[in-house]
Regions:
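Residue-level signal for pocket-adjacent positions within structured domains
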Residues: 30-32, 118, 179
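Short capping/connector residues at structural and topological boundaries
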Residues: 40-42, 90, 189
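Structural motif
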Residues: 43-44, 107, 172
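Structural alpha/beta surface segment adjacent to cysteine/selenocysteine redox centers
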Residues: 50-52, 58-136
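Secondary-structure boundary/capping motif
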Residues: 56, 89-90, 157, 185
Length: 202
């Protein structure tokens, strides 16, 4: 029987074949444009599933991500892929706004995500006002933010990507990271990332 629903502790190392299969499943194109930074040729790919209302995700974004970026991503050793896994409608609405701001530019998108993380408490308490505020910071009118939030196609794509992550990749909580196909759940420190990245760079 399938024990996927039982609480499990994942081993840190899985057989190479399973790992490469998972890596391929993670790399499968999703419905929304891929938001990634770093070299396409980087030996390590980190894919994060994140919710904009999740405090652990915000902590990673503000404390760990800048260090990963300066040491590994900008150096061409790590490619970083940011994927949405909204845990509630507020997070979904914030993700859609970040998509409208970023369009096809991952840097603009990540800048919007960074601001939304900084304003997370406000986003949760006063969702609409915060979305308008962040939109305005990026030159969007109230009308443009409202139009963005009414785009059902975007929400459907977001939902499809989340369903795939939940079913095929067994993502159940945020943040969840995949480092070259190894799944790690929860907020990791920079040191914990480094421990896992370094052996892959040899």
């Amino acid at each position: 029987s399938d024990m996927a629903s039982a609480p499990t502790c994942s081993p840190l190392t899985s057989p190479a074949i399973a790992q490469s299969a998972i890596a391929a499943a993670v790399a499968k194109p999703v419905s929304l444009p891929e938001m990634s930074i770093g070299s396409e040729k980087a030996p390590v790919t980190i894919t994060e599933y994140s919710s904009l209302t999740c405090p652990h995700c915000a902590a990673f974004g503000q404390n760990v991500f800048p260090m990963l970026r300066s040491k590994y991503i900008d150096a061409g050793q790590v490619r970083f892929v940011f994927r949405e896994f909204p845990l509630d409608i507020k997070a979904a609405a914030a993700s859609i706004l970040a998509r409208c701001i970023g369009k096809d530019d991952p840097e603009k998108y990540l800048a919007a995500v960074e601001i939304l993380f900084k304003l997370q408490d406000r986003l949760v308490a006063q969702t609409k006002d915060t979305l308008f505020h962040v939109g305005k910071m990026h030159g969007m009118s109230v009308q443009e933010v409202e139009t963005c939030e009414k785009d059902q196609t975007q929400f459907d794509k977001l939902n499809a990507d989340q369903q795939y992550a939940a079913q095929a990749l067994r993502v159940t909580s945020t943040p969840t990271f995949f480092i070259n196909g190894v799944r790690l759940q929860g907020a990791l420190s920079f040191e914990e990332f480094e421990e896992r990245i370094k052996p892959l760079l040899k």
